[in-house]
Curated annotation (Swiss-Prot):
<dbReference type="GO" id="GO:0016042">
    <property type="term" value="P:lipid catabolic process"/>
</dbReference>
<feature type="active site" description="Charge relay system">
    <location>
        <position position="336"/>
    </location>
</feature>
<keyword id="KW-0378">Hydrolase</keyword>
<feature type="active site" description="Charge relay system">
    <location>
        <position position="233"/>
    </location>
</feature>
<dbReference type="Pfam" id="PF01764">
    <property type="entry name" value="Lipase_3"/>
</dbReference>
<dbReference type="InterPro" id="IPR029058">
    <property type="entry name" value="AB_hydrolase_fold"/>
</dbReference>
<keyword id="KW-0442">Lipid degradation</keyword>
<feature type="active site" description="Charge relay system">
    <location>
        <position position="297"/>
    </location>
</feature>
<dbReference type="InterPro" id="IPR033556">
    <property type="entry name" value="PLA"/>
</dbReference>
<dbReference type="InterPro" id="IPR002921">
    <property type="entry name" value="Fungal_lipase-type"/>
</dbReference>
<keyword id="KW-0443">Lipid metabolism</keyword>
<feature type="active site" description="Acyl-ester intermediate">
    <location>
        <position position="233"/>
    </location>
</feature>
<comment type="function">
    <text>Acylhydrolase that catalyzes the hydrolysis of phospholipids at the sn-1 position.</text>
</comment>
<comment type="similarity">
    <text>Belongs to the AB hydrolase superfamily. Lipase family.</text>
</comment>
<dbReference type="GO" id="GO:0005737">
    <property type="term" value="C:cytoplasm"/>
</dbReference>
<dbReference type="GO" id="GO:0071493">
    <property type="term" value="P:cellular response to UV-B"/>
</dbReference>
<dbReference type="GO" id="GO:0008970">
    <property type="term" value="F:phospholipase A1 activity"/>
</dbReference>
């Protein structure tokens, strides 16, 4: 039985497919987007489902003590979310973020409990890598960085202030973008902020990510390596920023050799920065971005060029209105829904072509967290839910929220070692964009080796959280 849902498996890479560098945009996807190349289509769906894992595993119930955390351990994340390529990847690290609630309303959720696991941090994504079997089958060792988007409604668009700020803190000394390249404050604070009050945010999401990617690049330096950053909505902005960061700070450089390719594959992305950021991004020879955009979705138009923003990378434009499976009259949020976009990718045959599923992918996935499908498909709305919303009947006869099993409890990231090498990029020391105990400085120079941040199931004891 085909359970791949159309995503790229290690067994699909090789004979009959375009070379891996081309799929990652080495030639800017010339000749691959219209018509949409089959292997690239599968890679896009793989990235989309990596993003979906962040939604399916995120605890957003404010009644739970563990609201804002991931429901599953690294060892079980992909299996528990029924990720179709779970047999090909191992989750190496979890990423946690903190941010001032006023910087990006709706980006963080917190428990109402006085005994909450954290009052300052949220799980924001993960780093995964091809396991040994998949790398051997495909000839590629791929590091994936998946960022979670906001789980709130699109009301955040009305209240989010699109202020542009410099990101000199994450640019090396002497970089031509310093003082000129600017990104949206909301994205940047989530990416680069720390909070000493939280053991999960003593290091920024950025620091956690860079440490994880650097260690994996060092571990697999003798193999054919690449990095793919992916995200949807807010996560798309973080993925684009993170891909840029990896390249300009030399994390993609293998020893004294060349830089490995780094690609952002993003969905429904708001605009990230000003024209100078776009220029600096697109001038990097080993850096690419592919933005999958649904035509009726308005979020990619935000904040707009009128406010000083510019689009980054190549765009694959699809249109969900061509699908015969979805409603014609629907809410704006449905056009932005990730599974709606992935469904459209699965059946896309160009602007003038007929919509027809080109890979086997369940139509029911569209309604995973929406009501976008026509009622005639007989699929209930928003069907991906915890059984009884996590309520269980206790031995005392009382119904109560069930806490996570011990192996699924949140574990603070431990980062030791240099996040940025001194001889590759110097860490800027400009003032923080935030006040108080939270800081927006993107990097910390630490001594020693990276330790305990990563636990890849291929090499670590089974069952590690």
């Amino acid at each position: 039985m085909d359970k791949s849902q159309g995503v790229l498996l290690s067994s699909n890479v090789g004979a009959g497919s375009r070379p891996w560098p081309e799929l990652l945009g080495s030639a800017h996807w010339d000749g691959l987007l219209d018509p949409l190349d089959l292997t690239l289509r599968r890679l896009i769906l793989l990235c989309g489902d990596l993003c979906q894992v962040t939604y399916d595993s995120f605890n957003s119930d404010s009644h739970s003590r563990y609201c804002g955390s991931c429901r599953f351990s690294r060892a079980t994340l992909l299996d528990r979310t029924q990720f179709p390529a779970a047999g090909d990847l191992s989750v190496a690290a979890y990423l946690y973020a903190t941010s001032d609630a006023t910087a990006f309303p709706g980006s963080m959720v917190y428990s109402m409990s006085r005994e909450a696991w954290s009052k300052e941090s949220n799980w924001i994504g993960y780093v995964a890598v091809s396991n040994d079997a998949a790398a051997a089958a495909s000839g590629q060792r791929v590091i994936y960085v998946a960022w979670r988007g906001t789980i709130r409604s699109l009301e955040w668009v009305d209240v989010l202030k699109p202020d542009l700020v410099d990101h000199d803190d994450i640019l090396p000394e002497g970089h031509p973008g310093r003082g000129r390249s600017r990104v949206m404050k909301g994205w940047y604070l989530i990416y680069s902020s720390t909070d000493e009050r939280s053991p999960f945010s003593k290091y920024s999401a950025r620091d956690q990510m860079l440490a994880a990617v650097r260690e994996l690049v060092a571990r697999y330096r003798n193999e054919s390596l690449s990095v793919v950053c992916t995200g949807h909505s807010l996560g798309a902005s973080l993925a684009t920023l993170c891909a840029f960061d990896i390249v300009v700070n030399g994390v993609s450089k293998v020893g004294d050799g060349a830089h490995i390719p780094v690609t952002a594959v993003v969905f429904g992305s708001p605009q990230i920065g000003n024209p100078e950021f776009k220029k600096q991004f697109e001038e990097q020879p080993n850096l690419r971005a592919l933005h999958v955009r649904n035509t009726p979705d308005l979020i990619p138009l935000y904040p707009s060029g009128l406010l000083g923003y510019a689009n980054v990378g190549k765009t694959l434009q699809v249109d969900s209105k061509k699908s015969p499976y979805v409603k014609r009259d629907t809410s704006p949020g449905d056009y932005h829904n990730l599974q709606g976009i992935l469904h459209t990718v699965a059946g896309w045959d160009g602007k003038d072509g007929e919509f027809k599923l080109q890979v086997k992918r369940s139509v029911a996935l569209v309604n995973k967290s929406s009501g976008f499908l026509k009622d005639s498909n007989l699929v209930p709305e928003s069907w991906w839910v915890e059984r009884n919303k996590g309520m269980v009947l206790g031995q005392n006869g009382e119904w109560q929220l069930e806490g996570p099993a011990e192996e699924n409890l949140p574990v603070p990231p431990v980062v030791t070692g240099k996040i940025i090498d001194d001889d590759v990029a110097a860490v800027a020391t400009s003032s923080s964009a935030k006040e108080g105990k939270k800081t927006g400085k993107g990097s910390k120079l630490l001594s020693g080796l990276i330790d305990q941040l990563l636990c890849v199931p291929d090499t670590c004891k089974a069952g590690a959280a």
